[in-house]
Amino acid sequence: MKLKLKFLLISLLGSSLLLSACSSAATQVISSLSSAQKYFESSQGELNKKNVIKILKEGYESDANKAVHALLAGWKYTLMDQQLLSKEVDSRFIKAFGSGRDKGDVTPSVSEKGLYLNETYTGFSSQIAKVLGVQSQTVKQFNYKWSSNSDFKVQIQISMKGKVGSDSESQQLIKSFLSSDNNGSNQNGGVKETDFNGDSANFDGFFTFTYTPPTQSRKFGATSFDPLTTKINFPADLQIDVSTTHQKLNTLMEANEQVKQIKSRKFTGKTFDLLPFFYYALL
């Protein structure tokens, strides 16, 4: 398949990840994203997900660190350099992430799924997402360090612009959060519904997603490259920390028992599919 490259990624990767002289074609491919692009451009293989997984797996078995660095570079490039979360869903997105998917399915994202709201607010997670009223989101930072599958850290910061109570359903939820308890006392730090009227409903939020080695036995390895499910499974524990520029929201995150749960949460035993990000970078 003859492909026209839309971008070059050499500048993305440090010199330690650039193409090195070695006998294995697979290792050469995964040495950098740009070399993977060149591999498919030269018609050495059809660009499809199974072939990408096959090549990356062979590369991992030859040089694990370079393969993982290429995967993480693809994740970073697609999220931060391409600003995937700021774009409309198009044919390129669908090819990489699948039909029926949207930006809420991207890892990470400020969305009901991306924030795992159902695990914290079971039964009303969709309303919580509406309370946040996400208007836009931008990846501001993406830093990673990888030494081994038991020693790594990926940290991604997303800034978002939101509007508290952007619809009637979320306004009702806010009202229930701010209502007095059975004893007639208010435990919201003095925050009232009127604190979110008009322009006061607008705020900037900052969500930091930190991925660290899984505390369970599963770790990233050759079996993580799965051509049957067309996934590259990346096991990790995840911590999500939230802050905002809205003084009253920050007060609620300290004082209100429901709202404070979103401020800092940790999830164990999660698995994240990194293939769509690498594949998106190649399209």
Swiss-Prot record:
Keywords: Cell membrane, Lipoprotein, Membrane, Palmitate, Signal. InterPro entries: Lipoprotein_3. Residues 1-21 form the signal peptide. GO terms for cellular component: plasma membrane. The keyword Signal applies. Belongs to the MG439/MG440 family. A lipid is attached at residue 22 (S-diacylglycerol cysteine). This is Uncharacterized lipoprotein MG439 homolog 2. It is found in: Cell membrane. A lipid is attached at residue 22 (N-palmitoyl cysteine). It is a lipid-anchor. The lineage of its organism: Bacteria, Bacillati, Mycoplasmatota, Mycoplasmoidales, Mycoplasmoidaceae. Pfam families: Lipoprotein_3 (PF00938). It comes from Mycoplasma pneumoniae (strain ATCC 29342 / M129 / Subtype 1) (Mycoplasmoides pneumoniae).
